[in-house]
């Protein structure tokens, strides 16, 4: 690959000479290739030609290197705030190779969504959708498997971007305040099926079905060779990984729609809390845990949410070097990690339990404990701000009607989910106070506890206290996953650090808190110290 020369597109007034066309297709194509190539920086031209050649030959190493390294570098150098060359310009260079042009346009529109100030125009959003349709029709509708080799990281980011652009378009079409009547008419009538939820679900389910990924995952769980159930398509890594990533895409889509039960349900073949051979893409693993943990939290399965968040945050701490070389991926993962720390803090307030010491250390260093203390004291605004920062950007499955008032409907799904969450928080906001009193005693009369909570308590307040204690019992019993491929399964367990029962007017309290295992903490610190010591000895001064 040639070095970057810093050249930009020519602005010297070149014009397209129609009279240079001879009518001979071969000569005309050669003219167009030379014309567009002359307007393009040399390193961009050679990159595109080499990229096309690598895709044609199925050279996975070169494709991955150009996708992960060269393409972002050229984007930074030449197209930081502008789009890559148009389809006609690139097509002339690569002889309009059908497969490569679809892949190029996927990167082209992805770059526009990520880099162009103001975002893509309506026609670019529509063209991107139809380009995805071309790609998925190419690989799903074919009678035989398409012999296409792409690196797993590209397949993951392709599916992830597909869902992201659906989400982005849903928010775009819900914002009517910045659109003319003509644009609304075009969105609601002419292009009503573009980026529709049915299209998205149809594509993702089709990829899952054609790859037989569910059957393959079930076979692996049962110790059976997955190739016996994979079929002609599923035995190819290309289809297999697209199927797996589509399961994660479905998890994300259902989470964005607020259907948390279905979000966990679609992952049933995947044992969420176990490592698998398919979880080698860090961004995929982190995204999966984020949406699974959030779904658990909204289903009031706090113990499962805490375990999910804790496990993945530990994984991020240990594997940062795997993705730190790619700045945009690093930024995305860091943001998602920050969101998960916020969600973990919420879960620990609503459902206190022991977590790994290194996660506790991060919570202390980032001053989460101050906010957690405010939440424990019933500060609803802190709950609200944490939720709004950390939750997904929800969307509505249906666009506003063509005759809907000219308003901004983007926040409606978010406000609905926030209301659902805050209703649950309001039911629990007094429980930390109740817990703090119960932890001080082994036996405590009901009347005395009522007087602690309200010094002017009367008999009616004692009756209300029974309701509060029943609420405490109910909220502290969660469905907790223990084993099996379904993340929806589990057994009811009490997650509180204490338990109690009431005999007549006396509360009998038992402390069930599990003592800290300090041995593991010191072993980790000793190993870290030894590793640091070895590195210091290897430094030559």
UniProtKB/Swiss-Prot annotation:
UniProt record similarity statement: Belongs to the eIF-3 subunit L family.
PANTHER family: EUKARYOTIC TRANSLATION INITIATION FACTOR 3, EUKARYOTIC TRANSLATION INITIATION FACTOR 3 SUBUNIT L
Domain PCI: 308-516
UniProt keyword Disulfide bond, yes or no: no
Oligomeric form and interacting partners: Component of the eukaryotic translation initiation factor 3 (eIF-3) complex. The eIF-3 complex interacts with pix.
SUPFAM superfamilies documented for this protein: TPR-like
UniProt-recorded name of the protein: Eukaryotic translation initiation factor 3 subunit L
Annotated organism of origin: Drosophila pseudoobscura pseudoobscura
